[in-house]
């Protein structure tokens, strides 16, 4: 189910401590659901808004993971984006907000729905420029190379690339 681009990114970053050889929701007691210092730069502040808090969580936007097996790059210095989730990176001032409100930002972002005449938040973090490169073409499309916008209609924009090829990008809600 694709609700919005932020939810799509969260689906890609979801981590569970369950599975074969893993824990269950019942065995995840309070002390096991806490954020450990060793999670910094790997596991984000985002959590499920249910009994799965701490059992199902999310990676940070730029986790210090060095391979597909999940090995941690202990020798790498983390990035600023790697400290929080995608929603944390999008929410202006999240580091200065109440922790409960900051955590709820993730849940709230998953429920956002596009509509006509909405006004985007005027306070930005710059991370919104990264989102287009991380989501599927359902939400955004990155140009294939240098080119020029040659036509804009109500439904799409047309780009003519330097090599002469033409591509059409849909606009708005479909």
Regions found by a protein language model. Name each.
Residues 1-174:
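Long, charge-dense accessory insertions within large macromolecular proteins
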